[in-house]
Swiss-Prot record:
Keywords: Cytoplasm, Methyltransferase, rRNA processing, S-adenosyl-L-methionine, Transferase. PANTHER family: S-ADENOSYL-L-METHIONINE-DEPENDENT METHYLTRANSFERASES SUPERFAMILY PROTEIN. It holds the Pfam family GidB. Belongs to the methyltransferase superfamily. RNA methyltransferase RsmG family. This is Ribosomal RNA small subunit methyltransferase G. It is found in: Cytoplasm. Specifically methylates the N7 position of guanine in position 527 of 16S rRNA. S-adenosyl-L-methionine binds at G84, F89, V141, E142, R154. The keyword Transferase applies. It catalyses: guanosine(527) in 16S rRNA + S-adenosyl-L-methionine = N(7)-methylguanosine(527) in 16S rRNA + S-adenosyl-L-homocysteine.
Length: 222
């Protein structure tokens, strides 16, 4: 879907937006920020592959709602770290939603410069409380010294790798929320070979075969 998409495509996206906001309601102010974010994403998508092209007609239900649902699993969390933010899901979406919470902050970690540039522009355009870190994940989490309530990742890596990335932050008191797909059981089995974890599984509100893996404690197996 290009910025000059047809009326039919625009109508399809509008219908998808309505379905998403019924699923994960937001304030009028947050909706306006998300509108600006989606417009920017569609503009950049023409030159930078930020999301799978096949998902463009369903940006709101497939990506926005999928991201927003994390807030219900950590309602008191104000300081978030999103690993491998890419096109901004869930990091930018969370920042848009948390803009009305005084003092809230979302840190977006991205190692690819072009995507980090997009994320910075998205934070600027939406006026959301976010900071973009152009860095390898391992480099930044090991040195993290600030407060973190929740660490997230979506479409980034197998679960056992995500657990390893998140370990330093979880040991500082963060809760990990990872968006995973239909292979979650196999990924959990693989993860227990390397880590002692007590994950809680939440089915995705967006349907399909999506899951959210919540982890509060991580210990490396010897």
């Amino acid at each position: 879907m290009k910025p000059t998409s047809s009326a039919a495509a625009r109508n399809e996206l509008a219908s998808d937006k309505a379905a998403a906001l019924a699923l994960t309601p937001v304030s009028r102010e947050t909706e306006r920020r998300l509108d600006r974010y989606i417009a920017l994403l569609l503009e950049w998508q023409a030159k930078t592959n930020l999301v799978a092209p096949s998902t463009l007609p369903h940006l709101w239900t497939r990506h926005i709602s999928d991201s927003l649902q994390l807030l219900d699993l950590a309602p008191e969390a104000s300081f978030w770290v999103d690993l491998g933010s890419g096109g901004g899901f869930p990091g930018v979406v969370l920042a848009c939603a948390l803009a009305e919470r005084p003092g809230a902050k979302v840190h977006l970690v991205e190692r690819i410069a072009k995507k980090a540039a997009f994320l910075r522009e998205a934070i600027r355009v939406t006026g959301s409380p976010g900071t973009v870190h152009l860095s390898e994940i391992g480099d930044i989490v090991e040195k993290w010294s600030g407060r973190v309530d929740c660490v997230t990742a979506r479409a980034l890596a197998p679960l056992h790798q995500l657990v390893g990335f998140a370990e330093p932050l979880v040991k500082k008191g963060a809760k990990a929320l990872f968006l995973k797909g239909q292979d979650v059981d196999a990924e959990l089995t693989e993860s227990t070979k390397y880590w002692k974890i007590e994950p809680k599984l939440h089915s995705s509100r967006t349907g399909g075969q999506g899951w959210i893996v919540a982890i509060d404690c991580i210990e490396r197996r010897s």
